[in-house]
Amino acid sequence: MEKTVISVKVRQNSIEVSGHAGAAPRGQSVPCAGVSGMTWMLAKGLKEIVDLPGFGLSIADGHVTMHWDQLTQSAEDLIDAWFLGLCDIAEEYGCIEFI
């Protein structure tokens, strides 16, 4: 199976995650499941726990975009924790490209 990359773009007012790790057939990839679960948790946390002003979410096959007006400290803390988890997955599986 050809290995591809999950791309992660973190900007001041947005996060974009796209791609597939290619570590296993679609739906069976441990790194993809980890990134997907962590990213979904981040989106739910920013929307429902932090209630981040101007938060928006767009989901398509293999692509998630989140955007907001201005970060709060609570939102930054959630994003930092999410990012640390992604770094662990990247180190273990080598399938995440941070842009």
Task: Please report, for each region that a protein language model flagged, where it lies by residue.
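N-terminal intrinsically disordered, cationic/polar leader segments
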Residues: 1-30, 37-99
